[in-house]
Amino acid sequence: MSSPSGKTALVTGASRGIGRASAIALARMGAQVLVHYSTGEGEARAVVAEISKAGGRADTVSADFSAPDGAHKLAKQVRAIVGDRLDVLVANAGISKSATIEETTVEDFDRLFAVNVRAPFFLVQQLLPILGKGSSIVLVSSLAANAAVGTLAAYAATKGAIATLVKHFASDLGERGVRVNAVAPGAIATDLSSFTKTDAGRDFTLSVQALKRLGQPDDVGDVVAFLASNEARWINGDTVRVDGGSKL
């Protein structure tokens, strides 16, 4: 696949994990990638350096999505770099919080929805003027949106909201020629997934996993890049499970 060649892409939360893997996969396919970070500036610059070393083009952009104006500030930076055309938006940035219903605070709940739902919604809104015909938006949901996973009720609700937004975005933006899809990763070995870092968590994951291994960020990043490519031109409004066959 090489369809993103010569195109521009923004990947949020791209300093590590799935975002990093998505940025590198898109750059490998020829896209100029904007690597967004909130706090991991050094890690984001390392991603840019890795892309540049391989002959690609990348820049860093920064915004705090817990702030009400985070999406607006990021969109302003993006437009200053790419001008009037953004071809790919990967809204990956997110946070997690493990807590029982009794333990979940209003502050935790609001922050989860601010970063995981409000930010991607208004980022799409702010970037619509430069997302033209043929552009692709990829959101990141989670397998947790459709299953009771441990103590993740509030987090899972945010990912369920993302799966719903995909349908509405795809319907509303179809006339513009903009495709919108999502990936729903299962258990992936990232910093966000504390569950996979314990023996009990790994054992449980493998027990319900058809391929009997933990997913890696690259497993998801490659699917994100595919959904952004022309090869996926007839996939729209869908959420693709990327879980290696969990709970078949």
Residue ranges and their predicted role:
Residues 129, 171-175, 233:
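Alpha-helical segment proximal to the catalytic Tyr-Lys
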Residues 142:
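Residue(s) in the substrate-gating loop at a strand-loop-helix junction
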Residues 102, 134, 147-153, 175-176, ...:
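Active-site loop immediately N-terminal to the catalytic Tyr-X3-Lys motif
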Residues 15-16:
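Conserved glycine-rich cofactor-binding loop
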Residues 124, 158, 166:
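Active-site helix of classical SDR
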Residues 100-101, 105-113, 205:
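Substrate-binding pocket helix/loop in short-chain dehydrogenase/reductase
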